[in-house]
Amino acid sequence: MKILSLYCGAGGLDEGLKQAGFKTTLAIDINKDACETMKLNHDCEVINGKVSDYESSFGDFDIIIGGPPCPEFSRANKNRTFNSCEVDLFWSIVDRIKPSFYMMENVQDVIRVVNRDNYLVNVSDYGVAQDRLRRIFTNLPLPKSRNKKTLYDVLGNTGFDYLTDFAFPNRNQKCPSRNMSEISMTLTTMKHFYLTSIPIYTRKYLPKEKHVWLNKDKTSLTNGKPCREITHKERAMIQGFPEDYVFYGNDVSIRKQIGNAVPPPLANAFFSQIQIPITVLNKGNAK
């Protein structure tokens, strides 16, 4: 089956289809880093450009997916104006090509300008460890709720030895010259080390009293359970990406790619329902 992925971003929808047994044929996005991420994870043709510049060249496809960027509808945008932005272009392509299946994902308020069959879903019902409402436009039926997960289910076994893909690349190493499972009984030689990296099972060696280092350039430990920022890998796993999914770009770019992505388990839940008709299979094999 031929699959067209419009506004593919980091490939959340594509990964969901992949897990359901499908493979994207052509993907397009205006963001260069997102396109590189797609290339690293999906064996398909990827175009870095505007959908409007290529729409007339799109031929027949069996499935069309996409998540058009529409910040006008985001509730985080306090100056919202309800224009149709890229969604009209998405639907014009769907209406022209007439694929067997289609799916558009967006924020819930996009319903104000789109009069199509849709579902308002909470991604937590489909194996994503988030309470997040999304609007899904598709000709597929609403899948049953499945695989509810907590953050512990997703991140509980991520381990400690190395904080790979940490937001700051110079902070992902173990404590210099010693294993953190055998940390010093005192903090004299570790005073300026990043204490937020110390795992729970070794914190018994830390001073019991609470204390703070009032220096903006030094680590501050205020209680027995210091918190660190989650890594990019952990952010992606919370979105439902597999642990080995690779993201391309700098810190800010990767954060945006992960945050804007459609959770793969959501797409997987919808497309794993497809029982492909023989006529569709023959149509796909003939191309």
Each model region followed by its residue ranges:
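Class I SAM-dependent methyltransferase "Motif I" SAM/SAH-binding loop
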Residues: L6-A10, I258
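Conserved SAM-binding loop of SAM-dependent methyltransferases across substrates and taxa
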Residues: A10-F22
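C-terminal target-recognition/interaction regions appended to catalytic cores
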Residues: G159-K287
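Short alpha-helix immediately C-terminal to the canonical SAM-binding loop
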Residues: K32-E36
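Conserved acidic E/D residue at the C-terminus of a beta-strand in Rossmann-like folds
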Residues: I28-N31, E105-N106
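Class I S-adenosyl-L-methionine
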Residues: D53-I63, P68-V212
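Extreme N-terminal starter segment of soluble prokaryotic enzymes
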Residues: M1-L4
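Conserved SAM-binding strand-loop segment of SAM-dependent methyltransferases
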Residues: D43-V51
